[in-house]
Amino acid sequence: MFVTYSLDNNGVGHVFNRETLHVQEESKYQSIEISTLGILGKVLVLNNIIQLSEHDCERYHETFAHIPVSNLTTCERVLILGGGDGILAKELLKYKNVIVDMVDIDERVCELSKMYLLDLNENSFENKRLNLHHRCALDFCKKALVKNIKYDVIFADITDPHPNSPSKSLLSDSAISLYKSLLRKNGMLVSQTDNVHIAPNHVHDVKKTFGNHFETVGDFGIVAITLSSVFSFVYGSDSGMIQHRPIQVKTKWLNKTRFEFCLNILENN
């Protein structure tokens, strides 16, 4: 069966051959679907927008997790905003001493990911070093600030922050200020910033906002078949630009050559 999925909120989309519909339902917050689509393999779809695919899973999550962490002198505690599929958490839990706090408001996304994406998240939800919270991310961060909890990295693995998206508030100037106050000295904030060809202004807007709070703002990216384009990440830090560093954990896709490629891919896009 051929179905059309959006790549963003602007109506841009692709037609895929859906081999299997594993689950499709409405949660309190959004529509959720997990299907198998030909070459893409399993996909997670929220509000008819593809969030991840089995095909690009390793390159997306390994790049997102390990490029920032490789540039830290120490990494003891990290925060994931969103990330309800559990795959970014899986990558970060490879670091044996790291505690991961994950905040995803939609509990049902996590429940379905436990059931249908187990082969991708490798049961990360059961790891004792993962603290899972289902609440507003900003409320969680405000309470963490009161408790004086500090993070080495904060990852915004949220739905694409388009102008009409609920995620837009999670990358507002006030939100970035809040995240900055939760970072340890030399900590880093990293966010996915969408398809650079379909939504070129997103990268610019996020970098501008990050620049209000961090001495250094940079980006890196991957080529994703799911998007048929270059997918971007933006980071903010007071410790200089990300450099190529050895990766201290086992990865399937990310290696030295690809690390360097990811750091330079957005220069010509």
State the predicted function of each range.
Residues 1-36, 208, 227-269:
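SAM/dcSAM-binding transferase cores
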Residues 2-5, 27, 52-191, 197-207, ...:
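The AdoMet/dcAdoMet-binding core of the Class I SAM-like
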Residues 17-20, 30, 138, 218-222:
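Glycine-rich, charged/polar anion/phosphate-binding loops
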Residues 38-42:
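A short, compositionally biased
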Residues 45-46:
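A general beta-strand register signal
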Residues 83, 159, 222-225, 239:
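Flexible loop residues that form catalytic
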Residues 192, 214-225:
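Conserved S-adenosyl-L-methionine
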